Amino acid sequence: MTVDSALRSPMMHSPSTKDVKALRFIEEMTRNVDFVQKKVIREILSRNSDTEYLKRFGLKGFTDRKTFKTKVPVVIYDDLKPEIQRIANGDRSMILSSYPITEFLTSSGTSAGERKLMPTIDEDMDRRQLLYSLLMPVMNLYVPGLDKGKALYFLFVKTESKTPGGLPARPVLTSYYKSEQFKRRPNDPYNVYTSPNEAILCPDSSQSMYTQMLCGLLMRHEVLRLGAVFASGLLRAIGFLQTNWKELADDISTGTLSSRISDPAIKESMSKILTKPDQELADFITSVCGQDNSWEGIITKIWPNTKYLDVIVTGAMAQYIPMLEYYSGGLPMACTMYASSESYFGINLKPMCKPSEVSYTIMPNMAYFEFLPHHEVPTEKSELVELADVEVGKEYELVITTYAGLNRYRVGDILQVTGFYNSAPQFKFVRRKNVLLSIESDKTDEAELQSAVENASLLLGEQGTRVIEYTSYAETKTIPGHYVIYWELLVKDQTNPPNDEVMARCCLEMEESLNSVYRQSRVADKSIGPLEIRVVKNGTFEELMDYAISRGASINQYKVPRCVSFTPIMELLDSRVVSTHFSPALPHWSPERRR
C-alpha cells in the first residue's frame, strides 16, 4: 500500500481513489511544513500589504518571516478591537484585509458573557471545507464500512445577528451549516446524515432536537455513528430522549408528527420520512426507555450498529467521558479535528485512539502559525517559535496569522507537543489560557480544577453517585476569600444521597488535589478559607445553558464555563442550591513540597 502505507497502516484495507488523493495531500503538507508555512505567510503579507494595519508597522512590501516578526507585534483581542469595531460599523476600507470582510464569526461565550468578533473572508469557507474533506479518508483507514449506513449527528444553527454595518455575526458552525457548500454538498456515501437539512437549519433548537432525535429513532438500524460537536451536546441529546421518549414513541406509533413541530420546512421534509405507523418500533422504544429500565448502554441498545461516538472529549470536555461510557456501553470516542472561530487548525491522524492520547496534527496550509513558549512564571519577552521548530514535551500558546487579517493573534489555547508526523508537529490540547480561580497569589487553571473534581468524585462512587456537571467561582466577599464549587449530581439511590460527612470529605479531597501555592495559602498564610461545594438541583446546568442561548450563545459551541463571574449566572446558580458543604480540615502542606 502506498501513501506512506496509508498513514502507516492502522488496519491495512485499501483506501478508495478519492481517499488516496486526500491522504497524499496530508503527506505532502506534513512532509513540507516549513516550506508551506513560508509560502502561506508570503501570500498573506503580499495580499494584505496595502492594509491600514500592516502599513502602520512599516512592512513596506516585505513578505519574509523575519521582517514580519520584527515589525508586527503579538496581539490579543482587545488590541484589535478598535479595527474590528470599525469594520463592524460599516467601514469598508482595507483595514485588516485587502479582501472584503464578509462576516464575523463569534467566539463561544466566556465567563463574562462577551462575544468576540472574528473577521472572515469568502475563501475561508473553502479552507474549512478542505479540512473537513480530510476527516473521512483518515477515519476510513480505521473503521471500514461507514459508507453502508448513516450518521446521527445532533447539529444546530443559531439565528444570526447583524453588526451595525450590516455584516452577519454568527458562530462558525452556523456559518458552515448555512453555506452553499453544506446545503448543496455532493452525495457522499460516507457522509449521509439521518437528519434532514431542514431540521439542522431550524433556528428553534427544541424543534430541531426533536426532529433529529425522531429521525435517528426511525433509522436506528442504519446508524453507524453518533455525534455532536462537543461531548456535552451528545449528553444533552440523551437527556432530551429521557424526557421526551413517550411523545417520540407516540409519533412513531401513529405515523404523525407531534403538534410541537410548527416549522413548515421541517413538516414538509418529515412528510417524506415519517410516512406510516410503526407499532413495533414504538413498542421497542417504550420497552427500552421505560422508567424501570437502566439507561446504562442505552446508545447501543437503541442504535446497535454504532461503531463509535464522534465528539470532542479533550480539554474541558474530558469530564464527560465517564457519562458517555455509561450511556454508550464503552464505545470508542473519536476526536477528529481541532478548530476555532479564528481558524481551522488540524486533524487527528489516529481518531480511534483513547481520549487521553488525542493529538492533533496542524495542517500548515490553514494559516501561519507561531508558538509562544508557555512558562509557569512568565518571562518579560519570549521568542516565538516556528511550527516546524517546536520541541516535544514543551507547552506553547498558539499564535496565528490568517488570510482574513488577524496578525500574530494569541488564540489563548495552550498546547503540548507530543511528537511529529513527518515534519509536522502533533499537539495535545492542554487548556484555555487564564481560565483560573484565584484568591491571592494562588492560580488554579482549568486542568487542575477538573483533576480535583475527578479525584473528589471518586468518594461518591461507592453510592453510585456521579458529578454530571460543575462550575466554580472565587468568593472574595468573605474574609478570607475561598473557592466555591457548584456540583450537579446524578444520584443512583434517591433514598440514600451522599450525606454531609461524605460531601465534606469531597471538599477536602479537592483541596488536597490543588497546587502547593493554594495549600500554602490555606495552611501557612491563612489567606484562603475552606473550599465550599454547593450542590444544585438537577437540571440547573440545563437552565444555565438555556440562559446563555437566550443571550446569543450557540447551542453547538456552548460549553459550561468552568469559572463564572457574571452576576445573573451566579444568581441563577445560587437560587438552585439544595445543600452546602465545607472542607472540615486543612489540606497537607509543608515547605518541602514547594517546588
Swiss-Prot record:
UniProt entry tagged with the keyword NAD: no
Protein keywords: Ligase
Induction notes from the record: By auxin.
Enzyme class: ligase
Transcription found in the keyword field: no
EC number: 6.3.2.-
One protein family per Pfam: GH3
GO molecular function, one term: indole-3-acetic acid amido synthetase activity
Function: Catalyzes the synthesis of indole-3-acetic acid (IAA)-amino acid conjugates, providing a mechanism for the plant to cope with the presence of excess auxin. Strongly reactive with Glu, Gln, Trp, Asp, Ala, Leu, Phe, Gly, Tyr, Met, Ile and Val. Little or no product formation with His, Ser, Thr, Arg, Lys, or Cys. Also active on pyruvic and butyric acid analogs of IAA, PAA and the synthetic auxin naphthaleneacetic acid (NAA). The two chlorinated synthetic auxin herbicides 2,4-D and 3,6-dichloro-o-anisic acid (dicamba) cannot be used as substrates.
PANTHER family: GH3 DOMAIN-CONTAINING PROTEIN (PTHR31901), INDOLE-3-ACETIC ACID-AMIDO SYNTHETASE GH3.3 (PTHR31901:SF55)
Protein family per UniProt: Belongs to the IAA-amido conjugating enzyme family.
Name of this chain's protein: Indole-3-acetic acid-amido synthetase GH3.3
